[in-house]
């Protein structure tokens, strides 16, 4: 909705102005889940010189918040982009972030979607998440993300393949 997008634009414009006025870096707050699914706009939620949370899934950001001792009131707040009154991320996604992140992580690790469904994941949630991922493929690749340096199965498989080809 237009009013919701305007809120994101105004917020990011004010933050950009503050950062520029103070010769500071504007750190964005987009996480990997948001970026993969296009759950934001480049001029709004995805604005920033660097997305320092951009390599962490939404659920990992919450785990980090618990670890560093953020107030429970902040951590337990229902995720919402505040685009429309009382609308939550779960309403827009059709599932809680924990389920969506589980699907994204398994897809990153090249798990077959049908095997996820066969193991009990909701088929609609798996397919909806895949559609959102495919719809946004490549749209936000130019957004600078601070990598965490963690390994995933894709990287491990590539390293194993490289090692075996050298042998």
Name each region found by the language model.
Residues 1-167:
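ATP/NTP-dependent adenylation/nucleotidyl-transfer catalytic domains that generate, transfer
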């Amino acid at each position: 909705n237009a009013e919701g997008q305007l809120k994101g634009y105004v917020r990011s414009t004010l933050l950009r102005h503050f950062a520029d006025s103070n010769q500071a870096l504007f750190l964005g707050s987009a996480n990997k889940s948001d970026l993969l699914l296009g759950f934001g706009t480049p001029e709004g939620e995805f604005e920033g010189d660097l997305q320092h949370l951009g390599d962490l899934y939404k659920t990992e950001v919450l785990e980090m918040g618990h670890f560093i001792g953020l107030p429970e009131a902040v951590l337990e707040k229902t995720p919402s982009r505040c685009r429309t009154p009382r609308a939550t991320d779960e309403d827009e996604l059709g599932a809680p972030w924990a389920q969506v992140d589980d699907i994204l992580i398994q897809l990153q690790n090249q798990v077959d979607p049908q095997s996820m469904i066969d193991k009990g994941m909701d088929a609609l949630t798996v397919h909806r998440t895949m559609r959102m991922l495919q719809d946004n493929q490549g749209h936000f690749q130019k957004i600078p993300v601070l990598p965490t340096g963690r390994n995933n199965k894709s990287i491990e498989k590539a390293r194993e393949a490289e090692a075996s080809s050298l042998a």
